[in-house]
């Protein structure tokens, strides 16, 4: 299914399509002056707006969303409320050391609980289920790496609520021979990301936040001690600005310092038609857990509340240009469909009804970053690397503290003002990304080359 034009926002993902009719907020017309302006109506932007407004009920806060709430990564992702910070803990420890790895895990752990509590406390209609997540291996080499990860987590004391499952246990639960072993993380969940982000918008508006939709920011300037955002039909002048555009940050004009902080890379998903009772019985999966595998180019898959299965990942695209017109990837969609059938041959006749894709924010050192620009009028957040459902919400609380000039346990977290390694200029950046991408594909191919009826490799 081709990705449809941007005028059809409801078609950008299965989640948006299943949401049904959506009435976006009015665009900005004329000029407005506020205390805090936030560019980006996703998880980061709306969470920041909510938290700052709770702290400062009398403050004026405006969120400017270029498309509609739910259009970007916050409405297109897999909906995994999970504890992964950046990449695996081995990578974090190698780059940042023992103590920062532990702190990062605790932050991610707190973020998962934060999302769950906010949904429960505010009765958000997010289709949330706290069912846990498996990290599975298909090959002996993948399983050895999985065991090393678990042993490191034990060594660091961050293995709470994590258990190891054998192939026999997995086979009994899921009726497939493909899983060689797994780590099971109990304290994780899944949600419908488009419903959830629009629930955050509803809550923010109820608290007095103004959300302008279909209001792209064309130019950012910093006159005097203010920040000015020019839009097609007006302008916002603010005392402070939060840049919460993540993967779309590269498109902003007026903040050249942020251009090389991160790059967008594209991931893709498919979703089945609702499975019949017989199909569900044939594969087990009675407890509705979510999955990631232990590849370099991971697959992520999960059930939906209406009885479907989503499957994403397996490969990415790293375009060489600055456009965001890269949501169409038939080869990767076909791979995702075949991979689900490879795991569950019982589903060889299952139909797929939706296919979509979108960009995620990737820093060169594969670590999230929150920072302040210059005189601290501008705060930015980038680099969740496709694992941002949980992190973005707690990041919103952290950014609200920064906006308020507070020094808290969160603002002391080591990613604040860490100054990410910048991506090099083009074409060096593209050539480097391409080489890394091909290396990861080769890694997965080599580790999976002896798998039976191997459909996990992308050409």
Segments from the language model and where they lie:
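Active-site substrate-recognition segment that forms the wall
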Residues: 113, 121-129, 217-219, 225, ...
